[in-house]
Amino acid sequence: SCSRKGPKFVEYKYMAGSAQYCEHKNMKFMIGSNFIDFDDCTRCTCYNHGLQCCGIGANAGVFGVPGCEAVNDHCELVFLKKNTDQLCFIN
């Protein structure tokens, strides 16, 4: 799933007008920039219309595998046999 936040503006000090940017966790990003937030497992892009962040890996969407449970392993979705530490699938 994705979330969106509107753009932010800051007035220029010496020129007329304002600069537009996006803000995420108290950090400012230029329009056109993108980044991955591994704490939230999201990929974010700063557009003119604001910041869009979409889930990746473990937060990309929910689906089930019979007999297994999904576990978040640093934004990678891993399926373990229920009540064990054994992988359901080995690549």
From Swiss-Prot:
This is Beta-microseminoprotein. Its main location: secreted. Signal peptide: none annotated. Disulfide bonds join 2-54, 22-46, 41-75, 44-53, 68-88. GO terms for cellular component: extracellular region. Expressed in ciliated epithelium of nidamental gland and in secretory-like cells in accessory nidamental gland (at protein level). Expressed in ovary, nidamental gland and accessory nidamental gland. GO terms for molecular function: pheromone activity. It comes from the Eukaryota. The keyword Disulfide bond applies. Coiled coil: none annotated. The keyword Plastid does not apply. It is found in: Secreted. Transmembrane segments: none annotated. Acts as a pheromone. Triggers aggressive behaviors in males such as fin beating, lunging and grabbing. These behaviors form part of the competition for fertile females.
